[in-house]
């Protein structure tokens, strides 16, 4: 079983900016290359792209995005751009990639993948970009459900939660549901690529979940839509303009609708003593405690993410 991948702290709210994928492998160890004109060196192109993005992102994020994009363009690990920055680099494709990024398209969609829990996941428009906070939720489940026989991920999106659980807990049967056919296709692609054994089915979290997956399950895990619609204006342009809104937003007057529906279905789907694990909106922890108590769950625990925000909840069925 692979060791859990320790998520690193991220600055800012988890949905204000699309997170940046983490670095990859070690340098290939190639000797420093001959000097090249500044505009065509790795450093020159990095500086040029960073400058184009600085008006859209802060300087740190702009540099991070530029590094990831150029590493993909060059087919190099991130470390190679840093250890031999004066090496020449062909600019083929640079302008097209820079234009996409400058328009606000998330770098994960531009390069077509992101890192999550130590694995590379394909992402495209139509699925939410996995966040580091969700890695923390996966770590919690992996730690507490080592003896689980069956787990369900509701609203699987790219399949990042389900595939990560299947790989970390090979003794468990892992199932995953989503209402989006596009998301299920990408999740299936990721599971095949990673060799993760996951049963994927189309199902609506708001109704009929227990018909698609009768269970019983030891735990149900979900990162459902939870951002109030009124927060839309505060979202970064790369989130508002590109990520699927149906995977992010809920009506202000019924913001807990997905949690309520999953908790009610869970009473029919969980084994006695089975648990719910949710990622939650940072300002809804108190409401979640009340909701889960009303729905017949106990021993509710709320945990903060690495930014100190209430982000995860676990509750046991009585």
Residue locations for each model-derived region?
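S-adenosylmethionine
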Residues: 168, 172-173, 177-317
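Glycine-rich, flexible loop/turn motifs
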Residues: 77-78, 85, 103-107, 112, ...
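N-terminal auxiliary segments of SAM/dcSAM-dependent transferases
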Residues: 28-30, 34-111
């Amino acid at each position: 079983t692979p060791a859990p991948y320790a998520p690193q702290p991220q600055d800012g709210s988890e949905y204000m900016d699309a997170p940046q994928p983490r670095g990859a492998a070690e340098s290939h160890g190639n000797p420093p290359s001959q000097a090249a004109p500044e505009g065509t060196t790795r450093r020159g192109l990095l500086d040029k792209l960073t400058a184009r993005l600085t008006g859209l992102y802060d300087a740190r994020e702009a540099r991070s995005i530029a590094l990831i994009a150029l590493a993909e363009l060059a087919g190099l690990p991130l470390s190679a751009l840093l250890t031999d920055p004066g090496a020449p680099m062909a600019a083929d494709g640079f302008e097209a990639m820079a234009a996409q990024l400058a328009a606000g398209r998330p770098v994960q969609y531009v390069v077509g993948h992101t890192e999550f829990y130590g694995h590379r996941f394909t992402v495209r428009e139509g699925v939410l970009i996995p966040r580091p906070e969700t890695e923390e939720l996966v770590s919690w489940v992996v730690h507490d459900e080592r003896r689980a026989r069956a787990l369900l991920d509701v609203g699987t999106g790219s399949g990042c939660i389900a595939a990560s659980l299947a790989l970390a807990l090979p003794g468990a049967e892992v199932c995953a549901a989503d209402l989006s056919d596009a998301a299920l296709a990408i999740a299936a692609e990721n599971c095949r690529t990673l060799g993760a054994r996951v049963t994927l089915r189309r199902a609506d979290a708001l109704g009929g979940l227990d018909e698609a997956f009768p269970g019983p399950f030891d735990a149900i895990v979900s990162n459902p839509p939870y951002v109030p619609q009124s927060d839309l204006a505060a979202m970064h342009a790369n989130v508002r303009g590109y990520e699927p809104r149906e995977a992010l937003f809920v009506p202000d007057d019924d913001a807990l609708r997905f949690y309520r529906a999953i908790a009610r279905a869970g009473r029919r789907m969980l084994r006695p003593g089975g648990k719910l694990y949710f990622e939650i909106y940072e300002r809804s922890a108190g409401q979640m405690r009340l909701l889960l108590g009303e729905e017949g769950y106990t021993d509710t625990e709320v945990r903060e993410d690495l930014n100190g925000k209430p982000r995860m909840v676990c509750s046991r069925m009585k």
